[in-house]
Amino acid sequence: MIVGRFPSSRPRRLRRNENIRRLVRETHLTLDDLIYPIFVRWGENVVEEVPSMPGVYRYSVDKVVDAVKEVRDLGIPAIILFGIPEHKDEVGSDTWSEEGIIQRALRKIKKEVPDIYVITDVCFCEYTTHGHCGVLHDHDVENDLTLENLKKQVVSHAENGADMVAPSGMMDGMVKVIREALDEAGFKHIPIMAYSAKFASAYYGPFREAAESAPAFGDRRTYQMDPANSREALKEVLMDVEEGADVVMVKPALAYLDIIAKVKENVLVPVCAYNVSGEYSLIKAAGKLGWIDEKKVMWETLLSIKRAGADMIITYFAKDAARMIIEGEV
């Protein structure tokens, strides 16, 4: 590849003013790239801020519609729902109950805000007494028993209005059985966004407070991925695509930009990246202390995720980013 030499080649010529920089800009972040996470909890008339995530709230079902309308009115096309039930049990049965927290939220949102695209997180950690992502056996998650419960959960979500389901538990074979369950129940049109490369990350701390989903014992390293592994991430992604994933995800995003890029180069399905709670809270905390320009660092972070190859980004910054776009700050 010939790139030219100085002095005949001067890259600064194309940085001389904002107009030329706009013309040659390679990566663009738009409203169409954003998905906003929303926490729905039990109770009534509840709007409570998550202490470790300034600006992020938990909503009761009767209050969640206002939050969704705000997202819709900003031009953000999609939300992803996480539920916090009143009652937990050993298997997380609220996840497939007709009166489960997600089911009630889905019905209300789809009735009152039908033009928002609703993705549901499909897992068990928020719903089990032990905080792990499935059925326990000998102090570990039993993979195949968990698959049976996942099938019940996704069909229930689809019946109550989910536009897309997003299994996040990192169970082997989960995409295959979910696709089969949806198809058999008459939901062949419902896509699957698989949390394909989900790492056992320390960046999840604030989320576990928000969703009340911290494990009661041990950790999740027997099912979530080792942060040291890159080739294994690609293996997980390719297996999910073969099993029927319509979208694949890398989580977290910022510390795993290399994984996003590798996945993008090796699959033909859209790639989602999850800009997780710890990434959000780090920027919020440093911004509050005046150590960084919060808006600029937030924008640069999201832009880096898009540049790495993400086709869509789940981010708690979605509303902030949308306002910057609308107000012409970028």
Curated annotation (Swiss-Prot):
Enzyme Commission no: 4.2.1.24
Pathway annotation from the record: Porphyrin-containing compound metabolism; protoporphyrin-IX biosynthesis; coproporphyrinogen-III from 5-aminolevulinate: step 1/4
Name of the top EC class for this enzyme: lyase
A cellular component annotation (GO) from this entry: cytosol
Keywords of this entry: Heme biosynthesis, Lyase, Magnesium, Metal-binding, Porphyrin biosynthesis, Zinc
Entry note: cofactor: Binds 1 zinc ion per monomer.
Catalytic activity entry: 2 5-aminolevulinate = porphobilinogen + 2 H2O + H(+)
Molecular functions (GO terms): porphobilinogen synthase activity; zinc ion binding
Keyword Zinc: yes
Known cofactor(s): Zn(2+)
Entry's family note: Belongs to the ALAD family.
The name this protein goes by in its record: Delta-aminolevulinic acid dehydratase
Lineage, opening ranks: Bacteria, Pseudomonadati, Aquificota, Aquificia, Aquificales
Gene designation per UniProt: hemB
